[in-house]
Amino acid sequence: MKPTKELLAGILDEVRPLIGQGKVADYIPALAGISATKLGIAVCYNDGEIIQAGDTQERFSIQSISKVMSLTLAMSLYEPEEIWRRVGKEPSGHAFNSMIQLELENGIPRNPFINAGALVVSDLLHSRLAAPQYRMLELVRKLSCNPHLTYDKAVAASEMQHSDRNASIAYLMRSFGNFENEVMPVLTNYFSYCSLNMSCIDLARTFSYLANKGLPLGAKKTIISQTQSKQMNALLATCGLYDGAGEFAYRVGMPGKSGVGGGIVAIVPGEMSITVWSPELDPSGNSLAGTAALELLAERIGRSIF
């Protein structure tokens, strides 16, 4: 079954009663004031067709969803072994900002989608690029087909003001020899990436390359190889939703990536990319209503990688 606007709107109506049962991220002050009632879903087919319902054009802070794009950029700059000797490919089973395993495992983060792993990726970008923030924005604008996307300076500044834990993670990795650059410039880049403001439609278009073997919308050349696209989807399926990755795989059955801004992106390889947005989060930091909406959509259209 192919999603229709009516199907998507009906799913949003079904999950709307969940609003009020989660919690908007408040540890980043600039995000705490977001309306909890926002709810949207957008589907982008590999041919560029968009089907959407709800609040799909309003931009929000994508936060950890940006970790997929920063890893994509790193994959285009480094040989695989240069990346994977510094960050692992395993689920962590701990909170996204945990330091427990990092101490026990000699400063090597479990995967690139927890904070420690994303900071290593940001460190890699800082080592190889003269203007990493510019290159990241250039990539996202290209993938989304939207030249007007920007960083949210207020959100980035808010995160920098409350950066003690992320700085501690970076300094701990540096003490193990797994951080090449000065910590604060890398943190500045990292928070800028997280502050990207995008809509459901922007994100669905952006992630089309992972549904199409590395080929972005409207492009003639892949941005990562078919093999790398497959590997990225594997990582998203096992590590993309923090310590809720197993629950998401069980309920939704698609590779996915979440952010504490309330967005979740999911991939149906070979067919479509999907974005949902609902700012209230579950205890793992994933969108409560968004996960439920994706579960219903997967069931109704009969899609799963399992």
UniProtKB/Swiss-Prot annotation:
Protein name, as recorded: Glutaminase
List of residues binding substrate: 64, 115, 159, 166, 190, 242, 260
Reaction(s) this enzyme catalyzes, per UniProt: L-glutamine + H2O = L-glutamate + NH4(+)
EC annotation from Swiss-Prot or TrEMBL: 3.5.1.2
Sequence similarity: Belongs to the glutaminase family.
GO terms (BP aspect): glutamate biosynthetic process; glutamine catabolic process
Organism: Photobacterium profundum (strain SS9)
InterPro entries named in the record: Beta-lactam/transpept-like (IPR012338), Glutaminase (IPR015868)
Entries under Pfam families matching the protein: Glutaminase
Subunit description: Homotetramer.
PANTHER family for this protein: GLUTAMINASE
Key words of the record: Hydrolase
GO molecular function terms noted in the UniProt entry: glutaminase activity
